[in-house]
Structures are given as C-alpha cells and as structure tokens.
Amino acid sequence: MINFETVIGIEIHIELKTKTKMFSPVEINFNAESNTKANQIDLGYPGTLPQVNKKAVKYAIMLAKALNMQIDSNLRFDRKHYFYPDLPKGYQITQFYHPIGREGQIKLNNNGKEFEVNIERIHLEEDTARQHHKDNYSQLDYNRAGIPLIEIVTHPVLRSSDEACLYVDAIRKVVQTLEISEGRLEIGSLRADINISIRPLGSKSFSNKVEIKNLNSLKNIKLAIEEEIALQRAKFFANEEVLQQTKKIDEKTLKLQVLRTKTSTIDYRYFPEPNIPFIKLSKKFISSVKLKELPWEKEARYKSYNLNSIYLNSLLDDIHLANYFDSISYPDKDKLSKIFFAEVVSLANSKEMKAYHLNIDPENITKAINLLDEEVISGKSLKKLIPLLVNFKSDIKKLVKQNSLEQISDPNLISNIIKEIIKTNSELVKEYPTRQEKVLKFVLGKLMKDTGGQVNPTVANEIAIKSLDEVFK
C-alpha cells in the first residue's frame, strides 16, 4: 500500500479598504451603478499615467510586518500581459520581480499540534473588471477594475484540507484585525486559489498540480481539496497522468469542474512598468506604519481574562464584535463577557442583527452593570434594562426609575411583606421546624412573585430566615 503526501500551496487575494483605486483617484463604491466608477486610467486610455495609492502601500507594509516578512524598501511595479475582456489595458500592473514583502510565516494550531506556514511573498496589484455571464453573452462592470489588491502566496507547505482551512481563516482574521480589508470570502473581498498535487510519501519531487480558483467559503475549500486528492489518487493507481488543469467548484453540485487544461506555460511577458518610477520607501516611512493588536495577541489577552472558550472564539471570529466588546470599560472582563453575551448578543440575535448594530452606547452597558453591582437593580431588571438602552443617550438612572426597575432593598418594607406572607400562609409555615428549606423557598418565591422580582435577594433571604425563626422561638 502506497502512502501519499498532499502538497498544497495557496494564493489569497485580499481587496484593500482604501477610498480610491490602486492607480487612479476614482472613488471605490460597491453600490454604484455599473461602469460609473471607472476613469481613463482604469480603462487603459492612451496617454494616461498611473499614480500609486499611498494608503495601499501602507496597508501592504502593515501586512508584511504582521507576517514577519522582509520589506523591500524600493517599491517597483511590473506589467503582466494577457488578453481578456476584464482587462482593458491588455496588461495588469503588479509586482512580479520585486514584491513588497518576502519570506514570512504564520504559526497555527491544528487540534493542539502547532505548525508554521511559510509565506513566499506578498505583492500589490490591481483588480480586474467584474464579469456577469448570461446564457448567450457576458456583461462587464469596470467599477472593480483598478481596486487595490494584495496577493499572498505561500510556499507549497500545507499538507491537508484542515491545514488549508486554518491558514485561510488565519489570514482572514489578520487582515480584519489590521482593518485593511473586509476579508470576507462570501463577498469576494478575500479570494482563495488552491494549488494541489500528491506524491508518494518521502518523495521530494513535485508532480503536475491542479489549481482550483476563487473558492468562496472554508466549506468549499475543504470539499474541493478532498475531492481533488481523491481524483489524483485514483489516477495514480490507474497509471493515468494528472493533467495540469484549472478548475472551479460548481456552486449547485459542489463538485469540481475543469475550466481549462494547461498544455504549456503561459508567457505573460513581464517587464518593469515604465510609467511608475522606482519609489524609495524610507526607513522613517516604513517605521511609521504601526501594527494593531494581532489575532494571537488578542487571543492571549482574552485568555488572561479567563473568558470561556465559546465567548473567546466568538470575539476572535468577528473583529467588529471584538472591538465593540473592548470599547466597554467595565473592568471585570469575565463578568462583562457573561452579561454581554447573555443580554446584548442575545438581544441582537433575536432581532437577526449584529450586537454592534444595536446602537447601544458601550458606556451605558458599563453603567448598567455598575447599577447591578451597587444592588440598585437586580439581574432580572438588568435583562429588562438592556433592550431599553437601544438608541438611548440620556440619564440611565432616570430610565431605571421611569420603568420601575429599581431593586427593593428597604429592610422594613421587605420585612412587612414577608410577615404578611407568613400570616396568610400559616398552615404551611407550621412545617418550618421540620422542613425549613421547603418553607423558606415558598416564602421567598411568594415574595418575588408579589414584588415582580424586584426584591434584593440577599436582603430578602436574611429577613425571611429571621422572621421565620422568630415565629418559632
């Protein structure tokens, strides 16, 4: 029985969150009418000259730093030539010879087993137009042409579909945490191309690889890799050649389809972009690009708060939720996380929206929990209070009073109510000497019912025990 090793390399394109395009001053607006956000530079008119987007360069440096890469201080661009309708210039401006970042790595954990993914390069380039294929024709929207991209290319070091999914998800979290990209597979702001081959275990040579393009979910990445591995194994045992092909996954059947078979290496005729001179990136400029807290640093911080794993993973999976949580100044983060997820996130889920879209002022969440700590309100009242904080900008204490959410802590008032309960339920109370827990539970339950759950439970418990003990002195 021959054991095989899977060899996987991944190319990820991330769409950068800049206001304008990579080489033109055109505003990026994904909601604009088709072909209204493209100018002569984007469309390749003769005589136009590209201008490099400074923000995109900063984002690339930031990502290179996050991935521990060597940063090229000479910013240089090249032309990649090919003919296709989505590329009106006949070439794409990219960085073939001199990528802005080289030789980085990211450490990952697969069920307790740590491994490192070596990244060959990251480079800046421009996106192409969006294609809409109909039955008998195709439509092109050049609004996307020229949008800044960073391509991240690994060495062929991944060995399974699980490792590939972990890597893509890790890059997603990095770019979202850095806030340089939306990093969403489902909308195409992060696009993954997977290169797969197999070889006998121990072999050092590479066989023909199959490239699977534009995978738009972790589920599809896993399905595509596992199907392709099975296909290549079957070809090996049938003594058939694995053709160098480009494939895609069919969204309906979730099966692979061949787009084209490569019979020769494509000559893209790369050469330096003559209209963009070398740009020297000074040490001062590179050092001015600061990193934000990275996902693994954020994870360590949350673990120091003793957050449970469900809350921790929810925060790490959604940078916007994490930012909202972090904006709440309440100091006990463990207690905060329990209330935040039980009340705020649950409220958002009931409305089928995100917690950070509820428009609840983070400072009001802190004030509400402080009122709970001060025993001004009860846990039950807090549950009623949180929905009232949506769009609320005024005095939270007044809101509590207006809605009768204050906790009853007056010992005299509580004592009088308990004495009345004991008086009107004398037959049951007679059992107290022999069945203390049952009677006490009844009295406290009746007290909560009569007061709408507004009584301070600690004070109520002490007074109830004292009152019952006095009856049987």
From Swiss-Prot:
<dbReference type="InterPro" id="IPR006075">
    <property type="entry name" value="Asn/Gln-tRNA_Trfase_suB/E_cat"/>
</dbReference>
<dbReference type="InterPro" id="IPR004413">
    <property type="entry name" value="GatB"/>
</dbReference>
<dbReference type="GO" id="GO:0070681">
    <property type="term" value="P:glutaminyl-tRNAGln biosynthesis via transamidation"/>
</dbReference>
<dbReference type="InterPro" id="IPR023168">
    <property type="entry name" value="GatB_Yqey_C_2"/>
</dbReference>
<dbReference type="GO" id="GO:0050567">
    <property type="term" value="F:glutaminyl-tRNA synthase (glutamine-hydrolyzing) activity"/>
</dbReference>
<keyword id="KW-0648">Protein biosynthesis</keyword>
<comment type="function">
    <text>Allows the formation of correctly charged Asn-tRNA(Asn) or Gln-tRNA(Gln) through the transamidation of misacylated Asp-tRNA(Asn) or Glu-tRNA(Gln) in organisms which lack either or both of asparaginyl-tRNA or glutaminyl-tRNA synthetases. The reaction takes place in the presence of glutamine and ATP through an activated phospho-Asp-tRNA(Asn) or phospho-Glu-tRNA(Gln).</text>
</comment>
<dbReference type="Pfam" id="PF02934">
    <property type="entry name" value="GatB_N"/>
</dbReference>
<keyword id="KW-0436">Ligase</keyword>
<dbReference type="InterPro" id="IPR018027">
    <property type="entry name" value="Asn/Gln_amidotransferase"/>
</dbReference>
<dbReference type="InterPro" id="IPR017958">
    <property type="entry name" value="Gln-tRNA_amidoTrfase_suB_CS"/>
</dbReference>
<dbReference type="InterPro" id="IPR003789">
    <property type="entry name" value="Asn/Gln_tRNA_amidoTrase-B-like"/>
</dbReference>
<keyword id="KW-0067">ATP-binding</keyword>
<keyword id="KW-0547">Nucleotide-binding</keyword>
<dbReference type="GO" id="GO:0050566">
    <property type="term" value="F:asparaginyl-tRNA synthase (glutamine-hydrolyzing) activity"/>
</dbReference>
<comment type="subunit">
    <text>Heterotrimer of A, B and C subunits.</text>
</comment>
<dbReference type="Pfam" id="PF02637">
    <property type="entry name" value="GatB_Yqey"/>
</dbReference>
<protein>
    <recommendedName>
        <fullName>Aspartyl/glutamyl-tRNA(Asn/Gln) amidotransferase subunit B</fullName>
        <ecNumber>6.3.5.-</ecNumber>
    </recommendedName>
</protein>
<comment type="similarity">
    <text>Belongs to the GatB/GatE family. GatB subfamily.</text>
</comment>
<dbReference type="InterPro" id="IPR014746">
    <property type="entry name" value="Gln_synth/guanido_kin_cat_dom"/>
</dbReference>
<dbReference type="GO" id="GO:0005524">
    <property type="term" value="F:ATP binding"/>
</dbReference>
<dbReference type="InterPro" id="IPR017959">
    <property type="entry name" value="Asn/Gln-tRNA_amidoTrfase_suB/E"/>
</dbReference>
<dbReference type="GO" id="GO:0006412">
    <property type="term" value="P:translation"/>
</dbReference>
